[in-house]
């Protein structure tokens, strides 16, 4: 599946419009905005939409959407069924996850970096109880309407402090066991990170020196790619690891990046990933088609409150970070690091970001995405925005509908045409499975679905080869014939983009909400549907 949509990326990435045919729907439309009348009682109607103004309802809050944005971080000791770092406070499987979800609820979190520590299984196979523990965690993620940025690890100490660790045979044996388990839970996995080796699964400081051989690193990475469902990507810590595998292979194209040390300025621990380095440039070049994740160092570390950092403390620059996240098409960023950590004598970086204004001139100078009304109130007066909110709002995708055009005769058995245009104002396109439907909603809330051929992976913010980063306009286009047996009456027509899995499809929290301040977001009473309402339709009898 991934190979198929990768081919679509490569063949269509320079197009500025994407046209998708829809089969089998028939509707008749009525709206307050009418265009030019056609012949034979046909009309063309045009409805324009706008982005979100600062003083729109919830206009300064994050727009909750699946598989994008700020993320949490949770580490579970699978053998002992408790939190790795706070076992006394969270002596169970999901307590920390529930606590952090509540603390960060205002930050519109839909992703959780989920560490499964297999420390207790070095030298032996994973038990049935281990899989039951992981199942419990995944089920809680579903209950909380979140997905996992998944990483497996064994060792919790670095710089030669690890007391034990897995052998290569341990790692490979566990991956054999994990493959079917991950396939069963692919719905709740956004991406898999290439862990397993060394401290925190970051491919350094391993007890048995697994990272010291290119051969062992290549073997482990290729096995992780084999273990991971084919329709999911695998992220590595630095491009150096990705470059160990064949550049012409499908595995290479499925391999993405996570930068666990975003500090902007060069540093000996940055993995050679600062701006201007070959690694930085490789990520810029490949990231339009990859899921990119990252995190700042811990606030205690960057503020020189950690014994492992003897340097002077500093604040990670917010505007420079926003620019890097844009250049490298970031989908997600940790909200756990350098934000709400406790016990500091000063504020951490992300709190300073909330106090750092960002303006349209800076974004235009750096060709960064922004909606026309992002820096305005509804009355046209200027509105100030800060760099934290800008990053929160633009990580991943941000679909802003532009215009709906409807033409045709509003009668049963007659054909109408529908064109819906949009711009992706986010840093990246969409990934994984998100089918696109038009839906009809009657006055009783009954929903009728019409699947389109739209491929959301094509929704690039701009052509990656365009140095001006001009926003692309994408079009969903369809022709429909009004069904003969559709009851006459008033309907809402909407855009529904659910999760692609059968398990999560009918969960409104996994449906994609467009970034439009003048559009109703409709939830069905059973929470099966989350729909962007486009127009009111008056369907007439023949």
Describe these PLM feature segments:
Residues 21-28:
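Bacterial N-terminal signal peptides
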Residues 38-105:
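Boundary/entry segment of secreted carbohydrate-active catalytic domains
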Residues 97-154:
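Aromatic-lined substrate-binding rim segments of carbohydrate-active enzymes
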Residues 130-142, 165-191, 216-227:
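An active-site-proximal structural segment forming one wall of the substrate-binding cleft
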Residues 149-158, 178-211:
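Active-site groove signature of glycoside hydrolases
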Residues 191-198, 202, 206-360:
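Catalytic-core regions of glycoside hydrolase
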Residues 326-403:
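Catalytic cores of secreted or luminal carbohydrate-active enzymes
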Residues 385-542:
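Extracellular/luminal regions of secreted and cell-surface proteins that mediate adhesion/ECM remodeling
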């Amino acid at each position: 599946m991934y190979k198929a949509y990768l081919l679509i990326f490569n063949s269509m990435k320079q197009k500025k419009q994407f046209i998708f045919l829809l089969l089998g729907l028939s509707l008749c439309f009525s709206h307050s905005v009418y265009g030019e009348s056609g012949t034979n009682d046909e009309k063309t109607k045009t409805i324009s939409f706008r982005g979100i103004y600062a003083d729109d309802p919830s206009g300064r809050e994050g727009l909750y959407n699946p598989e994008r944005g700020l993320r949490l971080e949770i580490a579970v000791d699978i053998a002992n069924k408790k939190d790795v770092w706070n076992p006394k406070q969270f002596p169970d499987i999901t307590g920390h996850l529930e606590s952090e979800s509540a603390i960060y609820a205002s930050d519109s979190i839909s992703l959780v970096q989920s560490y499964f520590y297999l420390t207790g299984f070095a030298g032996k196979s994973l038990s049935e109880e281990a899989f039951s523990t992981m199942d419990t965690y995944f089920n809680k993620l579903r209950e909380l309407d979140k997905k996992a940025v998944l990483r497996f690890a064994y060792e919790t100490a670095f710089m030669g402090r690890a007391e034990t660790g897995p052998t290569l045979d341990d790692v490979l044996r566990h991956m054999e066991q994990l493959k079917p388990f991950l396939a069963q839970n692919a719905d709740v996995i956004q991406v898999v990170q290439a862990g397993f080796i060394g401290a925190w699964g970051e491919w350094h400081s391993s007890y048995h020196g697994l990272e010291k051989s290119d051969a062992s690193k290549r073997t482990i990475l290729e096995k992780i790619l084999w273990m991971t469902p084919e329709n999911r990507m695998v992220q590595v810590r630095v491009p150096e690891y990705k470059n160990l595998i064949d550049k012409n292979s499908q595995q290479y194209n499925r391999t993405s990046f996570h930068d666990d040390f975003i500090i902007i300025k060069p540093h000996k621990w940055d993995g050679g990933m600062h701006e201007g380095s070959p690694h930085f440039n490789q990520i810029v070049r490949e990231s339009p088609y990859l899921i990119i994740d990252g995190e700042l160092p811990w606030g205690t570390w960057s503020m020189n409150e950690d014994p492992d950092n003897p340097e002077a403390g500093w604040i990670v620059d917010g505007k420079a970070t926003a620019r890097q996240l844009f250049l490298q098409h970031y989908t997600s960023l940790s909200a756990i690091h350098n934000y709400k950590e406790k016990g500091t004598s000063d504020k951490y970086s992300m709190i300073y970001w909330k106090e750092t204004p960002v303006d349209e001139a800076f974004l235009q100078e750096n060709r960064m995405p922004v909606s026309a009304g992002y820096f305005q109130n509804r009355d046209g007066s200027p509105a100030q925005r800060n760099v934290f909110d800008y990053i929160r709002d633009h990580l991943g995708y941000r679909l802003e509908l532009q215009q709906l055009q409807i033409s045709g005769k509003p009668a049963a058995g007659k054909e109408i045409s529908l064109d819906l245009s949009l711009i992706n104002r986010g840093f990246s396109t969409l990934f994984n499975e998100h089918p696109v439907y038009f839906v009809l909603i009657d006055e009783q809330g009954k929903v009728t679905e019409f699947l389109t051929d739209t491929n959301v992976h094509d929704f690039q913010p701009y052509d990656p080869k365009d140095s001006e980063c001009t926003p692309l306009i994408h079009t969903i286009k369809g022709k429909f014939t009004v069904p003969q047996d559709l009851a006459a009456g008033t309907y809402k027509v909407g855009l529904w983009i659910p999760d692609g899995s059968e398990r999560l499809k009918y969960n409104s929290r996994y449906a994609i909400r467009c970034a439009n301040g003048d559009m109703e977001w409709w939830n069905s009473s059973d929470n099966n549907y989350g729909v962007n309402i486009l127009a009111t339709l008056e369907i007439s009898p023949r």
